Amino acid sequence: MNASFKAYRRRIMDFRGQVGIVTGGTRGIGNAIAAKLAQRGVNLVVAARTREAAHEVAASLSNHGVKVLGMKLDVSNAEEVEKVFEETRKEFGRIDILVNNAGITKDGLLMRMREDAWDAVMDINLKGVFLCSREAVKDMTKQRYGRIINITSVAAFMGNPGQANYSASKAGIVGFTKTVAREYAVRGITVNAVAPGFIETAMTDVLPANIKDDMKKMIPLGRFGTVDDVAQAVVFLASPDAGYITGQVIHVNGGMYM
C-alpha cells in the first residue's frame, strides 16, 4: 500500500470532530456501526431502550479518544426523541451523522398476526426513522451538511414468510429514504439506506446446522455476512467522500438479492 493511497484512505475514513447518533447501538449491527465510527474519530451518542446497556457501550467506546454518551431512547416516542437530540446539541453543538438502526421483529403468519404486533413493529422500525430524521435535519439544514443512513433489510425487497409487518416496515424505510433524499439534497444532506441480508448474530448462532446450510445455499458467496460487513458500508456512506451518493440502497447480502 503506497503512501498516497494511505493518505487518501485516512482522509475519507477520518471524521475527527464530527458528531453522530446511532439508534439501537448496543448490540449486533448497531454496536458494530458505533464502534467503527468511534474508531474514525466521531463523537457519538449511543441510544438504546435500556439506559444501562447504552452507558456500558458508551464507556467501552470512549477508549478510542472520542466522547461517547449513552442515552435511553424509545425511538417511537416523540418526546424522548426530542430530548435525546436536544441533549446532543447541548453537549456537542452539532449533529453530522444519524444512523437509524433501531428495529424489532414480532413474527407471525398474516392470518394469526395480532394488530398490536403489527403496530409495535411499525412504530419502532418506521415511525422511529421518521421521528429521528425529522429532528436531525433541523441541525443538518443549518449546517448545510449531514449524513443520514437508514438500516433496512433484504426482506424489504424479497419478502419473508411470517414477517409481513417487518418486511413492510423495512420497505417503508426505502420509500422514506428516497423522498427525504430529494427534499434535502439542496441543503447538502445525503440520505441513504443499507440493506443487510443474512448476518451472523446471536439469533443465527442458535440455528441448527442444517438450517444454516440451507440458508447459505441462497447466497452466491456461500456464507453469512458479519456485522462488520454492514458497518463498513455505513461508515462509507457517512464519509465526506460519499457526498455524491444519495437516495440509494446499498445491499450487503453476498449476492442473495441482486
Language model regions located:
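Conserved glycine-rich cofactor-binding loop
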Residues: 19, 26-28, 50
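Substrate-binding pocket helix/loop in short-chain dehydrogenase/reductase
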Residues: 81, 109-110, 114-122, 215
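Residue(s) in the substrate-gating loop at a strand-loop-helix junction
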Residues: 153
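Active-site helix of classical SDR
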Residues: 133, 169, 177
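C-terminal substrate-recognition "lid" of short-chain dehydrogenase/reductases
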Residues: 14, 92, 145, 223-252, ...
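Alpha-helical segment proximal to the catalytic Tyr-Lys
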Residues: 138, 182-186, 243
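The beta1-alpha1 cofactor-binding region of Rossmann-like NAD(H)/NADP(H)-dependent oxidoreductases
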Residues: 51, 72-83, 115, 228-229
